[in-house]
Amino acid sequence: MRNLAALLPALFLLGSSLLPAGTALAQPLHGISMHGTPELPADFRHFPYVNPDVKKGGRISYGVVGTFDSLNPFVLKGMRTTARGVWDPEFGNLLYESLMLRSSDEPFSLYGLLAETVEWDDERSFIQFNINPRAKWSDGKPVTPDDVIFTFSLLKEKGRPPFNSRLDGVAKMEKVGDRGVRFTFNDKANRETPLILASSTPILPKHAIDPEKFEQAGLGPVVGSGPYRIKTLRPGERIIWERNPDYWGKDIPGKVGFDNYDEISVTYFLQVTTMFEAFKKGDIDIYPEGDAINGTSDTSHWGQAYNFPAVHRGDIVKDVFQPRLPTGMFGLVFNTRRATFADEKVREGLSYALDFEWLNRNILGGSFKRTQSYWQNSPLGAYGNAADERELALLGDAAKTMPAELLAGTYAMPTTDGTGADRKVLKLAVDKLKEAGYSIKNGKMSDANGRQLAFEIMTQNPAQERIALAYQRSLNLIGVAMGIRSVDDGQYQARSNSFDYDMIIRSLPSSLSPGMEQLNRWNSLSRDAQGSFNYAGVANPDIDRMIEALLQARSTEDFQAAVRAYDRLLVAGHYIIPLYYIGAQWVARWKYIDRPDMTPISGNQKQTWWDARVQ
C-alpha cells in the first residue's frame, strides 16, 4: 500500500501529460469574462439589477413597427421578418437559449444557463461546456451535447451571417462524457471566440428540426428550451407568448427576477404614429422613444406629445435611463460598393455638406449632440483622447495619412452657423470635392466628363425622410443631386440584405467590449456577404488588422489602444456621415408596469420588469 501511495503522484502527472495541451488543470467555472474575471462569485443568487422578490404573473403588451412571416431569424430569408421574442435582446430570448448568459452590468462577463459550468485554459485553446442536467426542451426531452453539436453544424451549413461562421475558428467539436461538449480552436480563432460560442448562438433541438426544411423559415410548430411558448400567432399582426409552467431554468441564479409575466404579446404596426396612438389608448403598455435605428429620435415628441388625459391623471410614467455605454454611430451610410462613393475625398466632401446645426434646430427639437466617433464618451473612443505610443505603433503607416487633429483626439465635424447656408462650411465641402475631380459647372457639381454628382438615399419611415430632405436641401446648394426613395419595411430589409442602395440611414450600437461583431460590420470578408452588417461595403486591410488586434488583446491597455486606433480608422474613412446621439434612454410606460430601481451599464432591461397589478 505504501508503494502504491508513493506512485499516485507520478501516475497523476503521467495521466495529465496524456491530456490535450492546456486541459490538465482546467477547472469547472461558474462564469467567464473577456478580460479579467467575472464580478459575481460562484454562489451568487441573482444579478444586481433585478428584483428577486417580484411575484410572477399578469401580462405585458409590446408594440413594434414592421411585420413578420417567420419564426427563424437564423437564416437569410427570415433574418429581418422573424416574430419578436424568438431570439430577442430587447424582449428576451423567449423561445431559444444560449449556453451562457451575459451580464448587463459588466463589459463582457458570462454566467451559466444551458451550460451549468464551463472549462477553458489560459491560452483559450479550447472551451468545454457542461450541460445543466436539469435543462430540457418544451416537449420534456433533455438538452444534450448532441443538440449543441447539431446546432453549430446546422448553422454552419444553412445559417446566415454571422451564425454560419461560428465554426471557422474551431478545429474540432466533440462530445465529452454524458454532459460535456468541447470546442478545440484553430489559428483562425481569437480570444473572444469561446465567449461568442457561449453567449451569441441559440441552441436548437436536434430531434425537432428537419435540416432539409430549416431554410424555409416558416411559421410551423417550434420546440425551444426558453421560458415561453407560442399561444397565438397571427402573421404580420400579433404574436402572443405564454409562460411554460414547466420551464426548467426558472430557479437558476441568472434567471431569477426575469420572465415575470404569464403572457407577453407583441403587436405590429405600420407606422410609429399609429403605435403611439395605441399606447395612448392602453392597447400597448410601453412606448420607447428615441429609436436611433429607425431614425425616429425626436426630443420635441418626448417633450410635447404627452399632453393627454392618462398622463395628466398620473397613469403614465416617463422614465429616463442613463446607460454607461459609448454613443455608437447613427448616421448616413455611404455604400462604397458604388463607384460614386469609392473616393474617400468624395465622401468627406459630402459629409461636410450636411448642416447638422440646422437639422437639429429645425427638425429634431434642438436637444441632440453631434456624434464625432464610434466609441465617443468612453475610454475606448478616439474623440477626446490623443493617440499614445502603443496606439501609434498599431496604426503604423496608416497614422501618416490621418489628419493631425484626429491623432490628437480633437478632430470634429465642422460646426455651421445653423442658417442652412453657411458659406464657410459649404466651401469646405466644395473644396474637398474639387480634390476628387469635381467642379461646379452651370450650377451642377460635375466631374471632368460633365456628369453631375448624383445619388439616391433609401428611407423606411417619415422620420428618416425628414433627415433626408434636410440633407437634400444642403446638397442642392452645391449642385449635388440627391433623390429620396421611400420603401416599405419588406423592401427595405430585402434591399439592405443585398446592399441594393446608394445611401441608407443606420445605427451601429457600441459596447465597452467590442469584438467579433465588428467582423460582420467592417471586415473585408463581410463586404460581399449578403445579410452582413457591412452596410458601407468596407474592405480595408488596416481596419482588418485593427479588428484582429482588439480581438487578440490580452491586457486592458492593449485592448484600449486597439479600439481607439480602430475608431480613428473608421472616422478617417468617412464611411458614415455622423448624426447625433441622445445620451439617455427614454421610455414611457403605463404605471401598472413596474421596474427595478437599478439601471445597469447597458441601460434599461425590459426583461426584468413586471406587472404591478398582481403584486
Curated annotation (Swiss-Prot):
Pfam families: SBP_bac_5
Name of the molecule in the record: Peptidoglycan-binding protein YepA
GO molecular function, one term: peptide transmembrane transporter activity
GO cellular component: ATP-binding cassette (ABC) transporter complex; outer membrane-bounded periplasmic space
Keywords assigned: Peptide transport, Periplasm, Protein transport, Signal, Transport
Family of the protein in this entry: Belongs to the bacterial solute-binding protein 5 family.
Binding partners and assembly: The complex is composed of one ATP-binding protein (YejF), two transmembrane proteins (YejB and YejE) and a solute-binding protein (YepA).
CDD domains for this protein: MbnE-like
